A protein has these predicted regions:
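Glycine-rich phosphate-binding loops that contact phosphosugars or nucleotide phosphates
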Residues: 9-128, 133-141
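A short, well-structured juxtamembrane/interface segment
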Residues: 1-10
Length: 143
């Protein structure tokens, strides 16, 4: 967690990606970072992610929220990271994602929800994670 906080502080630009249900979590982190003076671009769709690909550089950080850590979104991010040599953080609830080995930061959160009601039960877990991450950022910035 501390390494992710340090990466956020040292990144030239930060992109936070979350689509569909993960968008809420991505938006929460963006607003929390803004309150601490750290600007971040929120990406909520595939078209936006494709457009941002032209701007991403080696000193940038892409933070991806994805409960399943599988699918088209992560493949697109993976291609960007490979091409642009930027850094990637994956926040997920899937400990067995194929993207584990290619992420600079791979954080697995506990999954509380049932398949029928996972969104309402899992969002509080991610919210607590966001608050802990902000706490680490505060500690680092105060040094």
């Amino acid at each position: 967690m501390r390494r992710l906080a340090e990466s956020i502080i040292h990144a030239r630009r930060i992109y936070i990606v979350g689509v569909i249900n993960s968008f809420v979590s991505a938006m929460q982190l963006r607003h929390a970072l803004l309150m601490y003076g750290i600007d971040a671009t929120l990406i909520s769709g595939y078209d936006e992610l494709h457009a941002v690909d032209m701007c991403v550089g080696s000193d940038d950080l892409i933070i991806v929220y994805s409960v399943s850590a599988n699918g088209k979104l992560l493949k697109m991010v993976e291609d960007m990271v490979e091409q642009d040599q930027c850094h990637k953080a994956l926040i997920t609830m899937n400990p067995f994602s194929s993207f584990k080995d290619t992420s600079d930061h791979y954080i697995v959160l506990p999954k509380a929800g049932t398949p029928q009601n996972s969104l309402l039960q899992d969002i509080p877990i991610v919210s607590v994670f966001n608050e802990i991450l902000i706490s680490y950022l505060t500690q680092i910035k105060e040094r």
